[in-house]
């Protein structure tokens, strides 16, 4: 049978709602998440805008400063010629302090290096055979003399023979200046003209280079590598320095004496040689003044009249009115003139004592 209207109307009436389904819950949760994301995005955008505003102001200030600096540099470049290469950095206070600190350290290093070098050169000056209280060897002369000294000693050790003094001194003075050569000669108690024949072109060829007018004194320089007993064993005050007779050797031996020889105006014997005297860098040997031979005449004896109270026989000889007599002692009766043999004996004795003990 057919249904009634009432029944069909009941179908169109709203039915009571039941509990929400799981789909509704999912949709609501998604909406909440979308809203939270939107809020976060809005906050981030606001923060970014604020940062951009702040940074924009700073960047604008920096840009303005850079533009001003560029304008100043352009003005300076217009005034000054352009320099090639890297541009010089602006000197700040920190860079200036670092620069000063580096310079101070470099100066201290250089000062210490020079102090060490000078101390080493002073020690070397004490070792080389050249010493003077008034003069000081330069650095280059000290190194040259040390090189020559090492070479001479190595040659002696290699050959195993006692060297000739003249050749030894010539090796020491090779390449040195004249003042340094004079200092070495003064240390060895030699005259530079005796071992430098090239400085005397007028010297006769038959004469030896070493003359007896300047005999070799004992080698007073003490070296750490050589024995000490031979040095200073001879006393120069006991050695007579005999000059040759003027009439026989005056012209030939004039180059070897400090002053030219004159006829019978100097005594036959001179006192010992004093240490070399330095005058403007030139060393020369000077005889010490002797009270016995100060006069031009030799061995003159004066007797005052007050002390001659004796017999009449003596009074006739030593009278007060008469001139003082001259008592000359011949040289031949005292010592024969054997200059070269004496010089060679002294050299050989000293060298043998040094290198064979």
Curated annotation (Swiss-Prot):
SUPFAM superfamilies, per database record: HLH, helix-loop-helix DNA-binding domain
Matching InterPro entries: bHLH_dom (IPR011598), bHLH_transcription_factors (IPR050359), HLH_DNA-bd_sf (IPR036638), NeuroD_DUF (IPR022575), TF_bHLH_NeuroD (IPR016637)
Effect of residue 274 to A: Impairs translocation from the cytoplasm to the nucleus upon glucose stimulation
Residue span of region Disordered: 1-94
GO cellular component, one term: nucleus
Signal peptide location: none
Biased composition (Basic residues): 81-93
Record PTM Phosphoserine, positions in chain: 162, 259, 266, 274, 336
Gene that this polypeptide is encoded by: Neurod1
Keyword Ribonucleoprotein: no
GO terms of biological process kind: amacrine cell differentiation; anterior/posterior pattern specification; axon development; camera-type eye development; cell fate commitment; cell surface receptor signaling pathway via JAK-STAT; cellular response to glucose stimulus; cerebellum development
Pfam entry (one): Neuro_bHLH
Residue interval(s) of motif Nuclear localization signal: 87-93
Listed GO MF terms: chromatin binding; DNA binding; DNA-binding transcription activator activity, RNA polymerase II-specific; DNA-binding transcription factor activity; DNA-binding transcription factor activity, RNA polymerase II-specific; double-stranded DNA binding; E-box binding; protein heterodimerization activity
First-listed, main subcellular location of the protein, grouped into a coarse class: cytoplasm
Name the UniProt record assigns to this protein: Neurogenic differentiation factor 1
Lineage top rank: taxon: Eukaryota
Cellular localization per UniProt: Cytoplasm; Nucleus
Protein function: Acts as a transcriptional activator: mediates transcriptional activation by binding to E box-containing promoter consensus core sequences 5'-CANNTG-3'. Associates with the p300/CBP transcription coactivator complex to stimulate transcription of the secretin gene as well as the gene encoding the cyclin-dependent kinase inhibitor CDKN1A.
Induction or repression: Up-regulated by fentanyl. Down-regulated by miR-190.
